[in-house]
Structure formats: C-alpha cells, structure tokens
Swiss-Prot record:
Enzyme class name: translocase
One Pfam assignment: ATP-synt_ab_N
Name of this protein: ATP synthase subunit alpha
GO cellular component: plasma membrane; proton-transporting ATP synthase complex
Ranges in coiled-coil conformation: none
Source organism per UniProt: Streptomyces lividans
Gene this protein is translated from: atpA
Protein role: Produces ATP from ADP in the presence of a proton gradient across the membrane. The alpha chain is a regulatory subunit.
CDD domains reported for this sequence: ATP-synt_F1_alpha_C, ATP-synt_F1_alpha_N, F1-ATPase_alpha_CD
Site annotation Required for activity: residues: S374
Length: 529
C-alpha cells in the first residue's frame, strides 16, 4: 500500500485559490404582501412597505395592479384587468416598475388596449422601446409658439376657430351633437398630407376611446378604414365594459405613444373621446379607495388629472426636434351647461373651445357650432394666410345676422339694408353646412367663404346654395386647376388672384341652373351689395 503523503503547501494554495475565486450567491430579496380587501376593481394590500407611488404590483394569477394610495399600514391599488380571481389572503409582489407602454411605428393602423396590447386580432406589434405613462410635460423653454395650421376640413371651424399644431382645442357639447364626427373628420382630413410622404406635412393620429360602446368604437374604426385614414391612426380603446382603472389610464397611454413620436420630430394629433368619462372613472376609483370627495363627489386632484394630461400637447422648439402634438379633448355637457365642474376645468386648461349646440344640431346646422362662445386663443396665428384674409368679417357678420334674425322674428318691417343682410346671413349659414366624412381642402374652403362673404352668391336661391357650391368647386378644379393650386400653396391672395376667382365665379354663374329651371342672370334679382 502506497504511503499517503500530506503536503501542507498544496492544501494552503488550494484554499487560497478557493477563497479568492469564491463569489457568494446574493440572497434573493422579494417583498411579498397580502390582499386584505378585494372587490369593485380595487384591492387593499398589506406588507409592501417599500412600494412606490404608481408602481405596478403583481397578483397571484398574474393580474397587474397600480398602487395609488400609499397609507401607513396598507396600499390601495386599482386592478388592471379582471378582478374576479383576486381574493383576500392571496400573495402580492412588487415589480419595481412604474406603469409604461411600448412605443413603435407599428402602432399605426392598430387597435390597442390601455396597456398597449393589440386587441384587433392582427398579431403582435413590433416595439422599439417603452415609455412611462407619467412623464413631465415639455418645459416653457422646450416649447415654441403655435404657428402651423392643423386643418379640420370644416369651413366653420377653420375659418372662425382655427386650430394650430401643438394647440389644445376643446370640443364640447351635449350628447348627439356631432363631437366625435368633428374629431373623426379631422383625422380623415389629414389623408392628403399623409400621402405626400413629406414628414413635415404628415400627421400621425391617435384616437382614444374612453367608456364608449364597443359598437361605437368599431364604427369609428370602420369609418377611418373606409376613408383611407386607418393607416396613419392608432386607436386606444377602453370601452364601457372595461374596469374603471382602464378608462382612467387610456388617455395617458395614447399620450405616451404620441409623445414618443413628438420627441422624434414628428407631428401628432390626439383625440380624447371623452374626458368626462375618464373623470367619472377616476371618481369611482377614488371613492372606492376612500379618498375624500369634493365638488360633485370628484376627488380634489381631478383638475390635475386633466391638466397634466393636456399640458403634454405642445409645439416643440427647433432644438427639441420641432415636433408637435395637437390635442382635441372632448367633453360632454348636460343641457348645454358649460359651467359644470369638468367643463370649466377643461376650458381653463385648453387654448380654446368649439361649442356644439343641440338646438343648432336639431335645426339641421351641421356642424352645430355656436359661433358666439366658440373661440380659438392661439390658432389665429397658425391660420392659412388666404383663409385669414377672407374670413376676417365672417364671425361678426354671423353674429349680426343672429341678432337681426331674432329681431325679425317679431315681424317688424325691415329696411332694404337689413333685409339684404338677413338674406346674405341665411346663405352663409347654409354655406357653412357640411356632411359627415366630407372634409374640404383649404383652397375649396377659401373660395367658398370668399364667395359667400363678398356677395357672389346673393342671387343664388338659399335652397340651391350647397349644390351651387359643389358644382362651382368642381368647375374650378376642372377649368382653373392652376388657380386653385396657387391658392393652396401661396400665402395671402393678391388682387390678381381675387380678380381671377371673381371672373371664374361669374363665368360659372352664367351656366348654373337653379332648382326651378332658371339660369342665373336671367330674370334674377340684382345682388344687394
């Protein structure tokens, strides 16, 4: 048997090598809490002392929750998803992450939920990164004044309450007054800009549906697809059947997707339809979390809910890439009461409002824009120069017409000048009507408004005004294509351009046949000037 030799130096070297190369496994540390109360879309959790505000928590079945209330002994969180499987006593773990959404160009043409997951059955979306939902809005020094037009395609809006890129313009009115139609038509009106392929003209659109019926969201998607506008639009859907937490988060998801594009130097249009339902969802969540109620039972921070959302819409400075995000929030009123809590809050945050009135809508005025209290505080500097030139007196003329109309209702005898003004006002009201899904190009709007305000349509019967306008524009595009192009691409119209338009209108009038079979100019009353 060989003799066993022990060499102390070998043992020492082996121990030294082991000690030097030894790396202890870090003990895994995970905070796990317990559900103490669950129901109605919220949960109370104990045992997570290090949780952050707005941190995502993970329940046993994989459902996520958002920590909103950080109290001394427990956390109040809103459940993001199906809450029927969450029960008292179940474990809850921290994720260490705040709520974020994936961002990418692949969102265009898709329908997603408030967590950014596709729900249109068209497969996964390739993403390029993530963006936190709660991010600071651009600072004053990162912004630039609004100076580029964002045309809606509606004469009444583009002429009297113009919108610029980076502006927040509120669309407010009772239910069934055409608020969503105005927003959807604005998206459709960006189609020609998108097809130019010019990044400075292209506008990416985001439609955030909050608390809408599923059928309504489907019809909006169908209208966009039918009109060729879905390819540059993302729909963030939180239908009425979704939990309150999803309706509360949906606008921030849409805003985060849009901000990513804005900081890349692109132009974005985002529509929140509508913020009244988001405020209602936030009120429900806050009351369930036992937050103290304020006016109309809304929590004290409901103003901050909307201000921090809408302040993200901006026109960035050249140093930041010169991108923009234009916001069109929609708010529903009750019985035309714009002095209620949420409407006054959002009016004070935004840069103007388009007030749609149910009486005008029922009278056949579409869009039902109340010119008296609709205003754009910054859009005038962004308005197309030609439109600004021709629409200057339109608002005043319409306001005077409404006063005169109310006076004439008493059957008083009017002088010739008042009768002339009344007749022209009736024609202008008729001229400003537009059908849904038929937005007009800038040059068409300019010609129509100029012809109406300068009396070029005074001899046209009121019943024929819309047909006259349609056929006139078709004639101009057919016979005077160069003239229409110069109006679109030029700035303020020169005297020569105005003269050419006047001559073209005069030539068309000679061949226009009214509904009673007469040609204009034959036995037509002289136009009152």
């Amino acid at each position: 048997m060989a003799e066993l030799t022990i060499r102390p130096e070998e043992i020492r070297d082996a121990l030294e090598n082991f000690v030097q190369s030894y790396k202890p496994d870090a003990a895994s540390r995970e905070e796990v809490g317990t559900v103490t109360l669950a129901g109605d879309g919220i949960a109370k959790v104990e045992g997570l002392p290090s949780a952050m505000a707005n941190e995502l928590l993970k329940f046993e079945d994989g459902t996520l929750g958002l920590a909103l209330n950080l109290e001394e002994r427990e956390i109040g969180c809103v459940v993001l998803g199906e809450f029927s499987g969450i029960e008292e006593g179940q474990p809850v773990s921290r994720t260490g992450e705040v709520l974020s959404v994936a961002v990418a160009e692949g969102y265009l043409g898709r329908v997603v939920d408030p967590l950014g997951n596709p729900i249109d059955g068209l497969g996964e979306i390739e993403t390029s990164g993530r963006r936190a939902l709660e991010l600071q809005a651009p600072t004053v020094m990162q912004r630039k004044s609004v100076h580029e037009p964002m045309e809606t395609g509606y004469k009444a809006v583009d002429a009297m309450t113009p919108i610029g890129r980076g502006q927040r313009q509120l669309i407010i009115g009772d239910r069934q007054t055409g608020k969503t139609a105005l927003a959807v038509d604005t998206i459709i009106n960006q189609r020609d800009n998108w097809r130019t392929g010019d990044p400075n003209k292209q506008v990416r659109c985001i439609y955030v549906a909050i608390g809408q019926k599923g059928s309504t969201i489907a019809s909006v998607r169908g209208a966009l697809e039918e009109n060729g506008a879905l390819e540059y639009t993302t729909i963030v859907a939180a239908p009425a059947s979704d939990p309150a937490g999803f309706k509360y988060l949906a606008p921030y998801t849409g805003s985060a997707i849009g901000q990513q594009w804005m900081y890349e130097g692109k132009h974005v249009l985002i529509i929140f339809d509508d913020l009244s339902k988001q405020a209602d969802a936030y009120r429900a969540v806050s009351l369930l979390l036992r937050r103290p109620p304020g006016r109309e039972a809304y929590p004290g921070d409901v103003f901050y809910l909307h201000s921090r959302l809408l302040e993200r819409c901006a026109k960035l400075s050249d140093a930041e890439g010169a991108g923009s995000m234009t916001g069109l929030p929609i708010v529903e009123t009750k019985a035309n009461d714009v002095s209620a809590f949420i409407p006054t809050n959002v009016i004070s945050i935004t840069d103007g409002q388009c007030f749609l009135e149910s009486d005008l809508f029922n009278a056949g005025q579409r869009p039902a824009l109340n010119v008296g209290i609709s205003v754009s505080r910054v859009g005038g500097s962004a308005q197309h120069k030609a439109m600004k030139q021709v629409s200057g007196r339109l608002r005043v003329d319409l306001a005077q017409f409404r006063e005169l109309e109310a006076f004439a209702a008493f059957g008083s005898d009017l002088d010739a000048a008042s009768k002339s003004q009344l007749e022209r006002g009736q024609r202008m009201v008729e001229l400003l009507k537009q059908n849904q899904y038929q937005p007009m190009s800038t040059e068409d709007q300019v010609v129509s408004v100029w012809a109406g305000t300068t009396g070029k349509m005074d001899e046209v019967p009121v019943a024929d005004i819309r047909r006259f306008e349609k056929e006139l524009l078709e004639y101009l595009h057919r016979q005077e294509q160069g003239l229409m192009t110069s109006i679109r691409e030029g700035g303020k119209m020169s005297d020569d351009t105005l003269q050419a338009v006047a001559e073209a209108i005069a030539a068309f009038k000679k061949q226009f046949e009214t509904s009673d079979g007469k040609l204009l100019g034959e036995d037509a009353p002289s136009a009152a000037k």
